[in-house]
A protein has these predicted regions:
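Conserved Rossmann-like nucleotide-cofactor binding loop
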Residues: 132
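Short, Lys/Arg-enriched N-terminal segments with co-localized hydrophobic residues
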Residues: 1-7
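Peripheral, non-AAA+ core regions of ATP-driven protein-machinery
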Residues: 9-12, 16-19, 23-89, 94-100, ...
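General small-molecule cofactor/ligand-binding pocket signal
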Residues: 151-153
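P-loop (Walker A) phosphate-binding loop of NTP-binding proteins
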Residues: 104, 129
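Conserved RecA-like ASCE P-loop NTPase motor core of nucleic-acid helicases/translocases
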Residues: 124-128
Length: 390
């Protein structure tokens, strides 16, 4: 009975913010950390002895050294055959790094990393908590299985995953997804704030001690942010965002955070039946080339990060069939569209108040660069006058 009491005394209940991970001893309507309302949920945690986390490969106590005396690492980046992912990561995968990939459901996150696992000539351990081994094998064959050293593991227990990783010693570890993992040291369900934080901390420690790079797939919330505590993005070395419209074939890979490279790089993929194909010249596929010039179409040049792109702006202007004119935009901010229409009406004298205006950015990409405002205005005026732009 005394042992039971001791065991139960080691567990406690606390409230954690789902947005930023702030811990509070009781429920609060407003989070003191991020100032958001109704984001605190109750989690049961287990009190474990707190140890100092060291990323050194030796267990002895560390002494402070001069920065000039620190030996440089001789290990270089691991280059990838996927030149778009290679570009976004800054030239390849850094050994011992931990990378987080987020994106909408069904956008292609698992496909991108599974493709990397089966096509790169590396020893890879692919851990999935969402699919069976048979399902992954079927997808791998469709994508073109070309790696005899790709290991599959369907497991959600983090301790078992780390044991397998220590035995196999892969050159790359992929976790699909971090929200499905759980550690036995925390008494809460997988995907909770505490579980995501503790699992990521253990994986981070493992990566730094073994120099095995890790890729994590993270789910996102309704507002587009990665699910889990905000501290998750601070713990990892890079945060990659995979975005695009599921009804279009093109996908964009952006680097939101990168400790080992630039965050201005952009990768573009085309979703085909045999997987995600890198697009070397995106301007060639984002702009339609036809023999007949059409009204309401304008081509603009823009820079996304440090990558120049040519994009096609398509506009349709017609008389309002109903009382209130409609304003619709795909890939472009509708508030900015309304502002441009007001400028054309007020300063340029074009009567557009009684017109329906529909705007689309070809290719399904989202653009927020103000450099295309002129192209948007010209496409609208071209459609209104039914005159093609030469």
């Amino acid at each position: 009975l005394s042992k039971v009491n001791v065991s139960m005394s080691k567990s406690k209940s606390a409230f954690f913010c789902q947005n930023c991970g702030h811990e509070a001893p009781k429920w609060l309507g407003k989070c003191p950390g991020c100032k958001e309302w109704n984001t605190l949920i109750e989690e049961r945690t287990e009190k474990t002895p707190k140890h100092v986390v060291s990323f050194s490969k030796s267990s002895s106590a560390q002494q402070a050294v001069l920065i000039q005396e620190v030996q440089k690492s001789e290990e270089s980046r691991i280059p990838l055959q996927d030149f778009e992912l290679n570009r976004v990561l800054g030239g390849g995968i850094v050994p011992g790094s931990i990378n987080l990939l987020g994106g909408d459901p069904g956008i292609g996150k698992s496909t991108l990393l599974l493709q990397m696992a089966i096509k790169e000539h590396l020893k890879v351990l692919y851990v999935s908590g969402e699919e069976s081994e048979q399902q992954i094998r079927m997808r791998a064959e469709r994508l073109g299985l070309d790696n005899p050293h790709c290991y599959l593991l369907t497991e959600t227990n983090l301790q078992q995953v780390l044991i397998q990783a220590e035995q196999i010693q892969p050159q790359l570890l992929i976790i699909d997804s971090i929200q499905t993992l759980y550690t036995e040291s925390v008494e809460s369900s997988p995907g909770s704030v505490v579980q995501v934080r503790e699992c990521t901390a253990n994986l981070l420690r493992f990566a730094k001690q073994t120099d095995i790079p890790i890729f994590l797939i993270g789910h996102i919330t309704k507002d587009g942010t990665i699910a889990g505590p905000k501290v998750l993005e601070h713990m990892v070395d890079s945060v990659l965002q995979f975005e695009g419209d599921r009804h279009h074939i093109y996908r964009l890979l952006r680097s939101i955070k990168n400790r080992f490279g630039s965050t201005n790089e952009l990768g573009i993929y085309s979703m085909q039946g045999n997987g995600l194909l890198p697009v070397a010249n995106p301007s060639e596929v984002l702009v339609s080339i036809g023999s007949e010039a059409l009204s309401g179409v304008a081509v603009a040049s823009m820079v996304d990060g440090i990558r120049p792109l040519l994009i096609e702006v398509q506009a349709l202007v017609s008389s309002a069939a109903y009382g209130t004119p409609q304003r619709s935009s795909t890939g472009f901010d509708v508030k900015r569209l309304n502002m441009l229409l007001a400028v054309l009406e007020k300063r340029c004298g074009f009567r557009l108040a009684a017109k329906d205006v529909f705007l689309n950015i070809a290719g399904g990409i989202k653009v927020d660069d103000p450099a295309i405002d002129l192209a948007v205005a010209m496409a609208i005026l071209s459609s209104n006058a039914d005159l093609a732009i030469d």
